[in-house]
């Protein structure tokens, strides 16, 4: 089920405050966040946000095509460990 149209998109308050401060000063710096559920809004365009994937923070540059998506969509949490080269049983 999607979010109601009557409600505004969710953006964590601490993230919104940091972005608005940077926009007022017209500065660009990496913003570190754990808030993967925050929606990307137009005021974030042009900023680099380091999103936590459970292990580390991945820096993501926000473009206009990302507006409306969640931050967590751009920081994958799972990585595939390759099978051993000489392990024939697992490659069947």
UniProtKB/Swiss-Prot annotation:
This protein's record includes keyword Translocase: no
Molecular-function GO term, any one: rRNA binding
SUPFAM superfamilies, sorted: Ribosomal protein S19 (SSF54570)
One Pfam family it belongs to: Ribosomal_S19
Domain of life: Eukaryota
Main subcellular localisation: plastid
Record keywords: Chloroplast, Plastid, Ribonucleoprotein, Ribosomal protein, RNA-binding, rRNA-binding
GO CC, one annotated term: chloroplast
One annotated GO biological process: ribosomal small subunit assembly
Compartment(s) where it occurs, according to its Swiss-Prot or TrEMBL record: Plastid, Chloroplast
Functional description taken from the UniProt entry: Protein S19 forms a complex with S13 that binds strongly to the 16S ribosomal RNA.
Family: Belongs to the universal ribosomal protein uS19 family.
Name of the molecule in the record: Small ribosomal subunit protein uS19c
Gene coding for it: rps19
């Amino acid at each position: 089920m999607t979010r109601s149209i009557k409600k505004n998109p969710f953006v964590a308050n601490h993230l919104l405050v940091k972005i608005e401060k940077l926009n007022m000063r017209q500065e660009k710096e990496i913003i570190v966040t754990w808030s993967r559920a925050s929606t990307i809004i137009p005021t974030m365009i042009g900023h680099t946000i380091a999103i936590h994937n459970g292990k580390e923070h991945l820096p993501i540059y926000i473009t206009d095509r990302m507006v409306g998506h969640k931050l967590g969509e751009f920081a994958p949490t799972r990585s595939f460990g390759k099978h051993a080269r000489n392990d024939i049983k697992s490659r069947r």
